[in-house]
Amino acid sequence: MDKIIKTISESGAFRAFVLDSTETVRTAQEKHQTQASSTVALGRTLIASQILAANEKGNTKLTVKVLGSSSLGAIITVADTKGNVKGYVQNPGVDIKKTATGEVLVGPFVGNGQFLVITDYGTGNPYNSITPLISGEIGEDLAFYLTESQQTPSAVGLNVLLDEEDKVKIAGGFLVQVLPGAKKEEIARFEKRIQEMPAISTLLESDDHIEALLKAIYGDEAYKRLSEEEIRFQCDCSHERFMNALASLPSSDLQEMKEEDHGAEITCQFCQTTYNFDEKDLEELIRDKS
């Protein structure tokens, strides 16, 4: 079971989220049949979305778009406050060999571009916020977004580790944020600890990576666990939703589908589930328009 644990330092100067997103990213890889670099890039963006959504309340939905200029194309993810996230990468077939340290290259294949966050509070007026991609490694781009757009100094680490067959081995991450009222010496102490932290990939390799992340973040300082919540890859598509999408088409288009294709087939971009609509379905839609 994937989870996100929310914590705060006893002093109230900092808060931290730590995540195990292994099953989330594994499900995404299986559904989209992504190759190595596409898997890691999509996985990191899914984790970034889980972090951002955990910061929201109510029925808020949050869309993250990594709009890069290189071979991966766009990466789109959508998360909600109930722990659900879905997403896809425009080019799932980017398969670049690992570096000498075993890391999968991502940044060069994301390229330059924008990190776009759309926050939908359900009021009909979603809020858009855009920052430039500074590295294409996703974690650094998320930290820059939080610091620049939300004016909250943040440290982010997230990664996806693959096994020898390029299947998802483990995935997770952390977010540390300075809270209002933090003293200069507290900030300096935490900055030093973050700078001295082992690489996120090293922490994820630990037997209990959640505890390893918390230990690396807080050291010997006291902290409180505020909550532990389940997170998952879950798409909200349905036959009814795509039926409504078809209903928005002109009658002439529906008639053409009926006569030439004898139906319609739609595949959800986010989860690759295919929905079929027969001639009777199309007839019903055409009749409703008349």
UniProtKB/Swiss-Prot annotation:
GO cellular component, one term: cytoplasm
Keywords: Chaperone, Cytoplasm, Disulfide bond, Redox-active center, Zinc
Cellular compartments annotated: Cytoplasm
Disulfide bonds listed in the record: C235-C237, C268-C271
GO biological process, one term: protein refolding
UniProt keyword annotation of Magnesium present: no
UniProt record similarity statement: Belongs to the HSP33 family.
PANTHER family xrefs: 33 KDA CHAPERONIN
Function, as annotated: Redox regulated molecular chaperone. Protects both thermally unfolding and oxidatively damaged proteins from irreversible aggregation. Plays an important role in the bacterial defense system toward oxidative stress.
Protein name, UniProt field: 33 kDa chaperonin
